């Protein structure tokens, strides 16, 4: 149970952090406080100061220190990346892609666009006995 909670918290913090700071393959933006996603390896790079500022604004109750956050989020440090020194990185979790979720519609399934769907809500028409002229 504890492991699940830790993983959920890790996922949540990383998702919020990446969504608010991410740039793709623009490593010159590291110094400007962005998280840079290497699209080939699905690894995100960032400066410790960027994470520190994010934690102070959004996740101060979750982690006591930035070092604790780096450890729990399973971040690693590299001395040098694309011209920047002391860069941290973490593999980006698979986030839900909102565009890829589409409900497949069965051709035989009725929808609100079909007349037959609305027929069930309409009062039934009773046939009145026809009067014949004699």
What are the functions of these language-model segments?
Residues 1-134:
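DNA transaction DNA-binding modules
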